[in-house]
Amino acid sequence: VTGAQGEGVARREPGMFCLVLHSHLPWLANHGRWPVGEEWLYQSWAATYLPVTSVLRRLADEGRTRLLTLGITPVLAAQLDDPHCLDGMHHWLGNWQLRAHEAAGMPSPALRELGALEHRASAAALEDFETRWRHGGSAVLRQLIDAETIELLGGPLAHPFQPLLDPRLRAFSLTEGLADARARWGHTPSGIWAPECGFTPGMERGYADAGVSHFMVDGPALRGDTSVGRPVWDSDVVAFGRDLEVSYRVWSPRTGYPGHAAYRDFHTYDHDTGLKPARVTGRSVPAEKKAPYDPALAAVALDKHVDDFVETVRRRLRSESARTGRDALVVAAFDTELFGHWWYEGPQWLEKVLRALPAAGIEIGTLADARARGYVGEPVELQDSSWGSGKDWRVWAGDQVQDLVQLNAEVVQTALDTIDKSRDANPEQPELRNRVHDQMLRETLMTVSSDWAFMVSKDSAAGYARDRAHKHAHALREIADAVASGRGDVARRLAEGWNAADGLFPALDARRLPGREAGTTGPTAVSAGSK
């Protein structure tokens, strides 16, 4: 049974529908707790990663396959496997249950009812975590990958905005990211979610060199024609575009299902328990006047939005197929964290939609399915683009973040120059594993994470974002200065100390950084499987 098959299937509609989810958070472990830091990770884990994987597991148990395409960034995957994060998550779930227990004993009937609801949810989450997740997320996700429930999309280490990245570091970040995926899940992804859907001409050649066959862009990058994937320039690498008409039906910068009055309000907290007691009620209703959350009302809205989405996809498939004279592809793409973290009812909606679409005669599949089935058109001369504001690079390269752009350029140049000088000093010798170089590249990649510029541009915890970028830049400079002044022992101690602080990407190997000349690797070729 594939995603395109289900009980009571209606007349088959033309074309194929692909749902793509992008799962990502920056590295948060040991970098603050509240209001920004590990709490962000644990909230997303409890509200999104646990319930969404449970939805997929239930559907997989029914024999359904190739339901959606799931991107998981290496930096998020690392946190889902990290012992510190696993311990922190276990503690967070226990605390959630205690808070729910406290709410169940409150004088307010509405809070007591909410407490009972939350206690059941926290108990189920604890059981799921202790049964399946306690030793890391890789095993949970690998079951879904092995069963072909999902197609896995990979990506570069630490989620850099690739168009602004030095080509050598861009290539290194991507190959290391794909190797990280293989180490965790036993699969090397053939497709990637390019961070922020960022693109500049020439990147397609790097993708081809890394073995990437397809990637996501936003719809306007393909001039709005997303009815097929498009080979990029003269390569065989295919860009699939997000259909904004369908995607924006669910969530857009201005509207979407989660804003319905009956759904749980994300922003309103009961400060005694930390629980969210209210429904949206209305866009302009202040927090203190919002009505209590009612699951029954939310369920009615949810069913309407499932039906609305199925009808939206059906209309789009029919209209695009008629317009192009061939079966059309419709790709809807979202941040995974929308489902549960931002939109409490999102996982329920997701499960209902993945059942309802096939029942309505709509074929669903993955991006790899779409490529294999021939949903590919003529080549496109893809230009600079992203899925950010304006669909250009302003979020990551605009005036508001010029300080970060300059910081990133300086840090990257410092790291590359330091490693190049070390290689030049021993041109005839095999390059041995150098933990100092490894840590320099880790800190460089953490500095250039796209998250920091995004947070500053959106004025969302901008101070935290700038602090994180400068902290990693400081670590890089400190190590590089020790190397440049010939203090090798100091450089090694610093590298060990900074590595211990994060413990991130232990398999990263600086020997795989390409050399100065295009198309070359370092003095010694080292496979991505080497330790």
Where are these regions (language model features)?
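Active-site and substrate-binding clefts of carbohydrate-active enzymes
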Residues: 8-65, 72-116, 120, 226-531
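Hydrophobic, small-residue-rich alpha-helical packing segments that form membrane-like cores
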Residues: 203-212
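Glycine-rich phosphate-binding "P-loop"
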Residues: 154-176, 180
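Short, solvent-exposed turn/loop segments enriched in Gly/Ser/Thr/Pro and often Arg
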Residues: 71-76, 156-158, 191-200, 367-372
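Conserved short loop/turn motifs at secondary-structure junctions
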Residues: 188-199, 335-339, 461
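His/Asp/Glu-enriched short active-site or ligand-binding loop at hydrolase and phosphoryl-transfer sites
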Residues: 213-224, 363-366
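CE4/NodB-like, metal-dependent polysaccharide N-deacetylase domain
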Residues: 170-194, 312-333
